[in-house]
Amino acid sequence: MSHVTGVTSNIRIKKTIDDIWPLTAKRVLVRVDFNVPIQNGHITNDYRIRATIPTIQRIIDQGGICILLSHLGRPAGISMTTAVRDVRRRYHEAHFHDNKGKTAFFSVLPPEEKIKILAQSSLREEATHIMPGVKSGKTILFARLPEDEKKQLLMQYLDEKKDNGLPQLSVSAGYEEQYSLRPVAVRLAELLGQHVYFAHDCMDAKMELSRLKRGNVMLLENVRFYREEDSKKEEEREAMAKVLASYGDIFVSDAFGTAHRDSATMTGIPKVLGHGAAGYLMEKEISYFSKVLGNPPRPLVAIVGGSKVSDKIQLLDNMLQRIDYLLIGGAMAYTFLKAQGHRIGTSMCEEDRLDLARSLLKKAEDRKVQVLLPVDHVCHTEFKAVDTPVVTADADIPDGHMALDIGPKTIANYVETIGKCKSAIWNGPMGVFEMTPYSKGTFAVAKAMGDCTQKNGLMSIIGGGDSASAAEQSGEATRMSHVSTGGGASLELLEGKTLPGVAILDDKE
């Protein structure tokens, strides 16, 4: 077993939301990571939303006004200047064109504004039967009105709004429905047990924000609808950050999943405001990674899987300075096995990384890190699920076969090693766990970590991404010490890198 000395974590402990007082009547901007999977308007995994509830609840309980910012997916986005021109064009059409533009303009108003307009129309009785939500027929009803009445209603509406700023449009040139955070607002309201206000345009929300009272929560629409969020030009990120920073008094980051990004909302807002604190989720992430990379209970095992050695070079190089055991699985294991002279059939292998694999194994030997590689495999001739895959007798894989999971002997070795340890960090699956015949290795590792956490007090950390998904699917996630919400962010921390979204927050004195 290795004897690691003199290695410290480069993660500094940060001020948290508990260090900010009072929150009463303060507008608290909270950058969260609500990048959740959505299919047909339904959220299929709400873990990231649930993980932020303690921070949001703290602000509500203290009488603060909680304003949430997040991204979702990778929409094409538009620039801020394009958005301004688009809004002006829509208002121009609504005002000055007799026979076009009015229904299009009405269609992009928020649902509650549409209801108000229809309530004053000649079709008000029919309007009373329309549900207040989206896609309930409001625009279709408005389209039936005579053109003169449409114009009169919209002119009256715009005149009422002129003192408070023009109404917010629910759809702009950058809007893509599949990336809208509206379903997240609905789910968040269910979890909180209170209404969550929704601003349809994150860059044009001042009027909506002015109506919020103590204890209210508002979610702004996807910040990536604007290209400035992730612009490579600092001045563009800063321009967006200045607008968003004007919405709040205090900045809190609970978005560990995007802490590796130097974006307008992650680093730009705290730069503009001159401060930033960690939410409870961010605090927990920092705390666990600081422990495992600094002075963890020993022995410490790293379980590393995934497709490519090249994706994990920096992680392996950094962790070999810190760990006692290294368990390797997934497709990357076959590059190591071939480097040792084993036959690997048609299994995935990075031929140009064989020397690198040998050097990493030599480095582990020099540092007295015990490396365990698969000693048997679950194989098939094709990349598909079958009822009776081939299980090899040893580490060699037959010609014409590809390994798709670790075998039962390897599982036993890995489970035994995890049982010897006091700390464990896992990044990357052991096989193609999405296919049931090849999920046993990954799920067995998850169960071993869960069992040892509950029975032996193992400090177990899942490094986000596919490992977190596997822990969830296996039912073991709640038995771990910590399941990270950040795949890319946790990987960069394990590589020894500094995360911009963490570094920008105020250090705890």
Curated annotation (Swiss-Prot):
Single GO molecular-function term?
Answer: ADP binding
List this protein's GO terms for biological process.
Answer: gluconeogenesis; glycolytic process
Binding positions (ADP): 306, 312, 330, 403, 427, 433-434, 466-467
What cofactor does this chain's UniProt record say it requires? Answer: Mg(2+)
Kindly list the positions annotated as binding AMP: 308, 312, 331, 403, 434
Cysteine pairings via disulfide bonds: none
Which reaction is this enzyme known to catalyze?
A: (2R)-3-phosphoglycerate + ATP = (2R)-3-phospho-glyceroyl phosphate + ADP
Q: Which amino acid positions bind ATP, per UniProt? A: 312, 331, 403, 434, 466-467
* SUPFAM superfamilies with a match to the protein in the record: Phosphoglycerate kinase (SSF53748)
EC number(s)?
Answer: 2.7.2.3
Question: Per UniProt, where does Mg(2+) bind?
Answer: 311, 466
Give the UniProt subcellular location, in the record's own words. Answer: Glycosome
Enumerate the residues binding (2R)-3-phosphoglycerate: 32-35, 48, 70-71, 73-74, 224, 260-261, 308
GO CC annotation terms, alphabetical:
cytosol; glycosome
**Keyword terms:** ATP-binding, Glycolysis, Glycosome, Kinase, Magnesium, Metal-binding, Nucleotide-binding, Peroxisome, Transferase
Q: Which Pfam families does the protein's record reference?
A: PGK
Q: In which pathway does it act?
A: Carbohydrate degradation; glycolysis; pyruvate from D-glyceraldehyde 3-phosphate: step 2/5
Give residues annotated as binding CDP: 306, 311, 330, 428, 433
Whom does it interact with, and what assembly results? Answer: Monomer.
Q: Family per UniProt?
A: Belongs to the phosphoglycerate kinase family.
Q: What is this protein called?
A: Phosphoglycerate kinase, glycosomal
Supply the source organism for this entry.
Trypanosoma congolense
